[in-house]
A protein has these predicted regions:
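Internal alpha/beta loop-helix hairpins
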Residues: 1-60
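Non-catalytic connector elements of ABC transporters
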Residues: 36-41, 47-163
Length: 163
């Protein structure tokens, strides 16, 4: 089985459903597949001795060593779009090591899970957490990103750089 994703009558990607979800070819497909949709934020790519990093306004996130280094190299010092799905962000207890933190604006109970809408420096991130997560609206949420699930997109062309 394959799904064709089109935008304005133009085929964006023709792939099995899991490939569309795991390896979207551009920002449109990444945002189209999945509910809630993928989170996006601007970051700057940095090269350090221990690998590549994505710098946000509040710090840096180490990128997976599995990412294509040749694809990342031309983007050092440039702004790209980082994408990550809500289920690939963990809300951890405050005080634990984390990548980002932000204020919980909405805690949307969905039954066995809760969708946290977190304001991170003016960017709204949706985080899918267990319904037992103790944080509520107004609290600070400490977030850990699954580095193996980070997607990077060219800010100008919107094409995928690396997954």
């Amino acid at each position: 089985d394959r799904i064709v994703v089109m935008k304005n009558g133009i085929i964006q990607q023709n792939d099995p459903p899991q490939n569309l979800y795991d390896y979207p070819c551009n920002l449109f497909v990444a945002g189209f597949i999945g509910s809630p949709q993928m989170n996006f934020m601007d970051v700057v790519i940095e090269k350090k001795d221990d690998g590549y990093w994505a710098r946000t306004g509040g710090g840096s996130i180490a990128l997976s060593s599995e990412m294509d280094k040749a694809a990342l190299a031309p983007y050092v010092g440039k702004t790209v779009v980082l994408g990550i799905r809500p289920e690939d962000i963990d809300a951890v207890p405050n005080g634990e090591a984390h990548d980002l933190e932000g204020r919980i604006e909405i805690a949307e109970l969905m039954g066995a899970e809760i969708n946290l809408h977190v304001d991170f420096q003016g960017v709204r991130l949706v985080v899918r957490a267990a319904s037992t997560y103790a944080g509520r609206e107004g609290d600070t949420a400490a977030l850990v990103l699954d580095r193996s699930k980070i997607h990077l997109f060219d800010k100008e062309t919107e094409l995928a750089i690396a997954h």
